[in-house]
Design a protein with these regions (language model features):
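Small-residue-rich hydrophobic transmembrane alpha-helices
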Residues: 65-125, 162-181, 285-349, 380-403
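Residue-level signal for short hydrophobic patches within transmembrane helices
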Residues: 24, 28-47, 51, 74-81, ...
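Short alpha-helical transmembrane segments in multi-pass integral membrane proteins
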Residues: 1-35, 93-158, 202-255, 311-376, ...
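Alpha-helical transmembrane segments of multipass membrane proteins
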Residues: 50, 125, 167-171, 190-198, ...
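Short runs within selected transmembrane alpha-helices of multi-pass transporters and secretion channels
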Residues: 86, 154-173, 181-189, 210-225, ...
């Protein structure tokens, strides 16, 4: 990876503006304070899908809930590449910020937004063309196919707003602002609830209403956050310069993460394919479970995002020892927090599942999944934080290989083996903790290998 140190007049106002915020002070305190808005922001982001499911599952029924769950994962797959590229933009920007290179911070923001805009337009077109065949490939039951196609075609219009929001949020986090994305998402979450009530409850628009509600909310958050970023960094008065060298740096870091995200999503599509073969109750149970597990996974993601920014800024500032210390403190803290949280949710699983669906058969299947996976989520915290150290330092290729091997290849192989032995929903659920353990071992091993090697840190 590249670390860039540029001599700048430390007394200049612009340099003060770009003073890094995670390169000094108490490590764990700074990590926690930065991660809290990230968690809250991700929580509100999940409201888009969760509120849709609450309205769909309780007002329209389990078939429509299954239609929403079996189709929305395709959007995740499509935007996976640009999710990684947005992280790459954040890593590059964070290192420039840590090095106090204000000119390249500005250029990084401009070129990252350009990448997001073009990519979002292209992916929306691809999604609209492929959505029908993709749902058939997933073996979505014919009883819910029409509703799944209807939901997906409208939902695909959210791709461009999602990408632009993710890009803007990643950049703001890179320069130390995790609060603004949260506030924008909170507003978008409230808007989403209102739109669901209008489109589903009042106008009776079925799954189309759920998709429209999400689209409107995503557009709102994307426009507000992107405009805020452009105005805050005073980009409107600048002549934007498309810098192919900088775009290459962002893509070099981001594409492996994007490929990682896409392949991971594809492996989840394979799992979804097997889930779809169990029937409507199990499809609905897994759809609801994936919403409930977000209460655990969202703080894990927040810890990982905070670590990426922390590592990026400290590498830019040349403070390697802080990274080594953070690896121990933040991993321990994250594992303890997630262990306690998963235990609480495990004890209250039935009540939480009932919020999403009143069907007792679906709840019973959901509880089977929870009892298998929730006790092991602390492993997921360790793999995410350790992997984020590597990603923040630019070792994105290594991260990609580990994820492909453990969370994709190993997961699918184990799934097939377990289903041969026992064709049950419990067999499907078991693949998750097993693959987490495999990934955690590989990530920790990779970190131990690189942490004392100088080639862990490169130069722009």
């Amino acid at each position: 990876m590249f670390v860039y140190h540029k001599k700048i007049n430390k007394n200049s106002e612009k340099t003060k503006k770009y003073r890094p915020q995670m390169t000094e002070g108490n490590i764990l305190k700074g990590f926690i304070l930065f991660a809290i808005p990230l968690f809250l922001g991700s929580l509100f982001q999940q409201l888009y899908g969760t509120v849709d499911l609450l309205f769909v599952g309780n007002i329209l029924g389990k078939n429509d809930a299954a239609a929403v769950g079996s189709s929305s994962i395709l959007v995740t797959c499509l935007i996976g590449l640009f999710t990684g590229i947005s992280v790459g933009a954040g890593v590059v920007t964070a290192q420039y910020w840590g090095a106090k290179d204000t000119d390249n911070v500005t250029h990084s923001i401009e070129n990252s937004l350009f990448i997001g805009l073009i990519g979002g337009i292209i992916l929306t077109g691809i999604g609209e063309v492929l959505c029908g065949p993709a749902l058939h490939w997933l073996s979505v039951p014919e009883t819910i196919m029409d509703h799944a196609v209807c939901y997906l075609r409208i939902y695909l219009l959210s791709i461009l707003p999602m990408i632009m929001y993710n890009m803007s949020a990643a950049i703001l986090r890179a320069i130390g602002d995790s609060k603004t994305p949260f506030l924008v998402l909170a507003s978008g979450g409230i808007l989403n609830v209102c739109m669901d009530a209008l489109f589903i409850g009042f106008l009776d628009m079925s799954v189309a209403g759920a998709a429209f509600a999400t689209m409107v909310s995503q557009m709102f958050t994307a426009v507000v956050l992107t405009v805020f970023l452009v105005q805050r960094e005073k980009l409107l008065g600048n002549k934007w310069k498309i810098d192919l060298n900088l775009i290459t740096k962002v893509i070099t870091v981001g594409v492996p993460l994007g490929i990682q995200s896409m392949i991971l999503t594809l492996s989840n599509l394979v799992v979804q394919y097997y889930i779809n073969g169990f029937g409507e109750n199990d499809i609905a149970a897994f759809t609801i479970y994936f919403k409930v597990e977000n209460l655990i996974y969202l703080p894990i993601m927040a810890f990982g995002q905070a670590m990426v920014t922390f590592v990026g800024q400290n590498i830019g500032a040349g403070k390697v020892d802080r990274i080594k210390k953070a690896a121990l403190e933040c991993n321990f803290f994250s594992a303890v927090v997630i262990g306690v949280l998963s235990g609480i949710l495990l004890l209250s699983g039935r009540g939480i599942l009932k919020l999403f669906c009143s069907d007792e058969e679906v709840i019973a299947e959901g509880l089977k999944i929870i009892h298998i996976s929730f006790p092991f989520y602390f492993i997921c915290a360790i793999l995410e934080v350790t992997g984020s150290i590597l990603r923040g330092a630019g070792k994105t290729l290594q991260s990609m290989v580990i994820v492909i091997v453990s969370l994709c290849g190993f997961r699918i192989i184990i799934l097939k083996v377990l289903l041969i032995r026992s064709h049950t929903i419990q067999a499907v659920a078991t693949v998750y903790p097993l693959s987490w353990f495999c990934a955690a071992v590989l990530f920790v091993g990779c970190w131990m290998y690189y942490k004392n090697k100088m080639d862990f840190y490169g130069a722009f």
